[in-house]
Amino acid sequence: MAEGSYGFLCREDGSWWRSWLQQSYTSVRDKSAEALEFMKRDLNEFTRVVQHDTACTIAATASVVKEKLVVEGSSGTTEKVKKGLSDFLGVISDTFAPSPDKTIDCDVITLMATPSGTTELYDSTKARLYSLQSDPATYCNEPDGSPAEFDAWLAYWDPEQRKAEISEPLVTSPSIRALFTKMVPAAVSHSEFWQRYFYKVHQLEQEEARRDALKQRANQSVHSEEPKWEEEEEDFVGAALTPALKLKEKCVISPPTIPTLHVEDKSEKTAELNRDHTSVTSPSESSESISPITQIANPEYIEQTSSKDPSLCTLTVTKEKIAAETDKSSAPVEQTGKSNAQMGTHREDPPSDLRVFELNSDSGKSTPSNNGQKGSSTDVSEDWEKDFDMTEEEVQMALSGVEVSGEVEDEDWENWE
């Protein structure tokens, strides 16, 4: 029992393998046959195109050379040679010349051979029309496009009114005449033949019109865009220059017209003015150089002169006189009055609320030296402390002198006005 079942399974496996191999062989054979057919078709088409192009080129070249060899008034021997060569080229041209229905399709120009052996140049429109006329599918198949458009065109097409248009292609085109003779009425009727042909011509004209419109539109867009770019650049430059001109008009600087007042005083006074607000810099190292400028801020003087014209007072005092003033503390008020009497006024510099004192060092006190070397900052500060060592009573008397000098200055201003 087991042996019988095993033999049955072996037979089934063998039949399955045979059927699978048969199917695989059949599919491979069919695909190979299809591939071979495609290859044959491509090779035939390639060979036909090459032969057609070569024949047309040889025919055109032979025709041109044959025409150039025809020379009037030549000698007998030369004429015989040229005639023999011309005949040889004529044979080549007749052998390789294609039929009038065959053309060389180019992008713009088509070279067509005529029955007389010459060639004519066709543009793209004429080449398409010639291809349409020589194609049997134009008359046998239904027109391309929607049937509604074809029916609408047929509504306005009348064969009786188109007799002249129908007779013209029969006379001028040998390909249409040959196809008309073969196909009418065996394949198509007379009306269908001409309806399909003229509708295809109508579609070709519409396509050419659309192409011309696209070319014109592209040319117009190119010409119209160039001036716009220039106008945009001009507008941008003008917009960039306008704010700059406005800023130049607004930014006009007027010269200063505020009168100023200079007061120079070389008197022996003004050493005790505002000790609390005095900022004294160290004197110069050489006895003949001019010391840095000392600035003294006087708030009371600023308040008194706020309602009047501001002025700048420059007082020149030597250090020897300042040292002498430290010993003479008995009459600061009288000395201040004398100094105010010697003040001179000049209108030159811009206004200021500070009094600037310029100290000229005439003595060697500010430049102590150690073995011919420059003195240190501590020695200079000690000398200044000795020169300006004052008691509290002397400071109060100096402040009272400043107040009195302010009153005298006000009187001088009134007299000056």
Swiss-Prot record:
PROSITE patterns reported for this sequence: BSD (PS50858)
Gene3D superfamilies: BSD domain
Compositionally biased region (Low complexity): 281-292
Compositional bias of kind Acidic residues: 380-390
A single Gene Ontology CC term: cytoplasm
Superkingdom of origin: Eukaryota
Skewed-composition ranges (Basic and acidic residues): 262-278, 345-356
Residue ranges that the Swiss-Prot or TrEMBL entry lists as coiled coil: none
Polar residues biased stretches: 332-343, 360-379
Disulfide linkage: none
Positions of region (Disordered): 215-234, 262-292, 323-390
Domain BSD: 153-205
PANTHER family assigned: BSD DOMAIN-CONTAINING PROTEIN 1, SYNAPSE-ASSOCIATED PROTEIN
UniProt name for this protein: BSD domain-containing protein 1-B
Native organism: Xenopus laevis
